[in-house]
Amino acid sequence: MTEKLKNSKEVIAYIAECFPKCFTLEGEAKPLKIGIFQDLAERLNEDEKVSKTQLRAALRQYTSSWRYLHGVKPGAVRVDLDGNPCGELEEEHVEHAKATLAESKAKVQARRKEQAQKAREEGKAKAKPAANKKPQQPRRTNKPKVQKPTKPVETRALNADEITVGNAVNVNMGKGNMAATIVEINKDDVRVQLANGLQMVVKAEHLRA
């Protein structure tokens, strides 16, 4: 089964390959014969790669491109699919192309201006809070203080159902217990977070209530 072309860009490339004397992909485009869609539809009627709907959309894109509109100028001659001349352009068509081109360029310029303005505003918004910040003091490289174990208090071993993430526990440090919160459980290994923010991995048997 023949694979259909996916988008107008592919369709334009395909018809330029089929009719190189009429359609071009680079340089100034030639004005097309009035009613050329019908000619295209008839010539590609049996072609499974492209549908009439795709042809119509591709032609619309091709004839509204700046490259094509630049080619619609006084003295230019329309061509058919085989590159044969089909009459000189009428003045009203030239004027229409000129107006369309100017309008299209104005829209692009306005859009670029709007995007540039937006980028400037975003840049100012980011710079303003930074300017208001006080100079940061040099960070000290001292190691974080480890919380000293508290004096032994009367505790008991945890039951299995008490070893759950988020539970407040005491960690038996030998000389005393340290308050902590369970953050992760991996079989017998339990990761806890001490009150000072430090995390450590201990055996479940070292946890007390």
Curated annotation (Swiss-Prot):
Protein encoded by which gene: proQ
Keyword Cytoplasm set for record: yes
Source organism of the structure: Vibrio parahaemolyticus serotype O3:K6 (strain RIMD 2210633)
Keywords: Chaperone, Cytoplasm, RNA-binding
Name the record gives this protein: RNA chaperone ProQ
Subcellular location: Cytoplasm
Family: Belongs to the ProQ family.
GO BP term, example: post-transcriptional regulation of gene expression
Family annotation (HAMAP family): ProQ (MF_00749)
NCBIfam families according to UniProt: PRK04950.1 (NF003434)
SUPFAM superfamilies: FinO-like (SSF48657)
Main localization category: cytoplasm
Function: RNA chaperone with significant RNA binding, RNA strand exchange and RNA duplexing activities.
GO cellular component terms listed in the entry, alphabetical order: cytosol
Region span, Disordered: 101-155
Pfam families: ProQ, ProQ_C
Basic and acidic residues bias spans: 111-125
Entry keyword Cytoplasm: yes
GO terms of molecular function: RNA strand annealing activity; RNA strand-exchange activity
Compositionally biased region (Basic residues): 136-148
